[in-house]
């Protein structure tokens, strides 16, 4: 999985691991572990079940059925009961307990307005709760205070100085034990409803197999595409990058670069 970006430059850590053999803990059974053919067939069955599960999620229609604290208490403006998820906005975000404690993503929020920063970080934490992602509490980062001294004007008042003070606030949220597809959905939802004036840094942890380098070398120009977080985005830079990735010029130079690197690797 390539590095994914959310608003700003992003780094992606990768933990390489092998798939262990499924050992049988029972000492009475003569078969101590799975054979290679059995293990391969088991993996195929798991992949088929995973694809069927994803297809079921895409095809099934979920009916919106909000829960209410009380159906008798009505909102004086809308004349309707207040949904539970709207009532929870008055309280701090609810967290799901981590199951394994494997960190999959971290989002940092930085901005000059403290209220916008709290709103953005709590929005990410609430979205993680409704997506079933175990998430940490919203944590504060170190506040940065900077003082800038500049001249008032380059001519008549060149010797007069003027001071400007800028305070940068920060928050961060950790996500645990979620699949890459759910993390992509979470980040795309946050990117879609991003608040202006808040800087989002997403650090994503992914796990790849030992043959990841071979798969990376086998990529072609047709496999290069924008992350799912930019689908439906109005960002002109993202739209221009997507246009360049689909252009024939990019495919031409990408194939030429792969051909130029192949003789060096053979040596």
Curated annotation (Swiss-Prot):
Task: Tell me the GO BP annotations in alphabetical order.
Answer: translation
User: At the top level of its lineage, which domain of life is listed?
Assistant: Eukaryota
Residue stretches spanning the membrane: none
GO CC terms, sorted: mitochondrion; ribonucleoprotein complex; ribosome
List the SUPFAM superfamilies.
Answer: Ribosomal protein S10
Q: SMART domains, alphabetically?
A: Ribosomal_S10
Could you list this entry's UniProt keywords, alphabetically sorted: Mitochondrion, Ribonucleoprotein, Ribosomal protein, Transit peptide
User: Where is the protein localized?
Assistant: Mitochondrion
Residue spans making up a coiled coil are none
Q: Which InterPro entries match?
A: Ribosomal_uS10, Ribosomal_uS10_dom, Ribosomal_uS10_dom_sf
Q: Transit peptide, first to last residue?
A: 1-10
Pfam families in the record: Ribosomal_S10
One of the record's GO molecular function terms: structural constituent of ribosome
Principal location: mitochondrion
Function per UniProt:
Involved in mitochondrial genome encoded proteins translation. Involved in the binding of tRNA to the ribosomes.
Q: Which family does it belong to?
A: Belongs to the universal ribosomal protein uS10 family.
- SUBUNIT field: Part of the mitochondrial small ribosomal subunit.
This chain belongs to the protein called Small ribosomal subunit protein uS10m
